[in-house]
């Protein structure tokens, strides 16, 4: 066998190994793998200094936690174009129309999906939302790096989401403290008791229970019911996902 032929064989085997690894990964693993790669690429294109020079970087932020505490509705609405579980959700209405409709309906805040590959969102969606409403905006993203928090601040977010399932306790502490140093609030998302217990710390403002299992995308409101009493009262408690009717509320 020639050296070239051997090289091709090894390349084919490496490719096969990668394909096998991807097939065994759940959707959350795939998203995080892609997200880490995406962040590194963006850091090479847009330096931190450019984000910090944004017009919105030093702008006033709104407190979602305070509004939730004093609200009649207690609702955080969401702008989402699509998802891995439901394909296309909103392909016809502009960001401006959607978020204005939410604000006029009396919601406390709006969650804006900014992941492009899996949810069809973008930071431009967050920017358009900022220009359209004057209520708190949550950047809903798979945050794994401080750079993404700087992006959130530069594009008009008031709140960031941290997902306990993809972060260690040390990472949650580092990222949440960094966000608060920029004047951003932090919503920490958990799905089970183990994630909750590893995550409780002073640098969080809100703790949410995701009713959707991010590894399988199965939904059950029982997750919120079971964990709500375990969340300390010092944190605003949020039930996330799977709420699609008045009865669910």
Predicted regions, residues:
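A cross-taxon signal for low-complexity, glycine/charged-rich
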Residues: 1-2, 6-12, 16-19
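An N-cap/entry alpha-helix motif that binds or orients negatively charged groups
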Residues: 26-92
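Conserved, mostly hydrophobic/aromatic
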Residues: 31, 77, 102, 152, ...
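Alpha-helix-loop-beta-strand connector modules within alpha/beta enzyme cores
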Residues: 62, 120-138, 142, 173-188, ...
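Active-site mouth loops of central-metabolism enzymes
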Residues: 79-94, 136-144, 187-189, 238-239, ...
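Glycine-enriched alpha-helix->loop->beta-strand junction motifs that scaffold or abut catalytic
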Residues: 106-107, 132-135, 154-160, 180-184, ...
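Catalytic cores of alpha/beta
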Residues: 144-155, 193-202, 243-249
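Active-site/ligand-binding-proximal alpha/beta "capping" segment
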Residues: 201-249
């Amino acid at each position: 066998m020639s050296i070239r032929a051997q090289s091709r064989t090894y390349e084919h085997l490496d490719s096969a190994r990668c394909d096998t690894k991807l097939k065994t990964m759940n959707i959350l693993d795939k998203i995080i793998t892609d997200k880490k790669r995406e962040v590194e690429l963006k850091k090479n294109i847009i330096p931190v200094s450019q984000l910090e020079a944004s017009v919105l970087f030093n702008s006033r932020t709104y407190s979602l936690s305070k509004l939730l505490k004093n609200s009649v509705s207690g609702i955080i609405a969401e702008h989402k174009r699509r998802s891995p579980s439901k394909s296309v959700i909103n392909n016809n209405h502009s960001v401006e129309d959607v978020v204005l409709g939410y604000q006029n309906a009396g919601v406390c805040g709006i969650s804006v999906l900014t992941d492009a590959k899996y949810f069809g969102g973008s930071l431009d969606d967050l920017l358009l939302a900022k220009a359209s409403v004057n209520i708190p905006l949550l950047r809903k993203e798979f945050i794994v790096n401080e750079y993404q928090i700087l992006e959130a601040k530069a594009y008009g977010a008031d709140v960031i989401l941290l997902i306990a399932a993809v972060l260690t306790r040390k990472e949650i502490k580092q990222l949440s403290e960094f966000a608060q140093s920029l004047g951003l609030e932090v919503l920490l998302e958990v799905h089970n008791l183990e994630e909750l217990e590893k995550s409780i710390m002073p640098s969080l403002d809100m703790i949410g229970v995701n009713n959707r299992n991010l590894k399988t995308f199965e939904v059950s409101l029982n997750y919120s019911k079971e964990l709500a009493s375990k969340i300390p009262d010092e944190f605003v408690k949020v039930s996330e996902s799977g709420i699609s009717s008045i009865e669910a509320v």
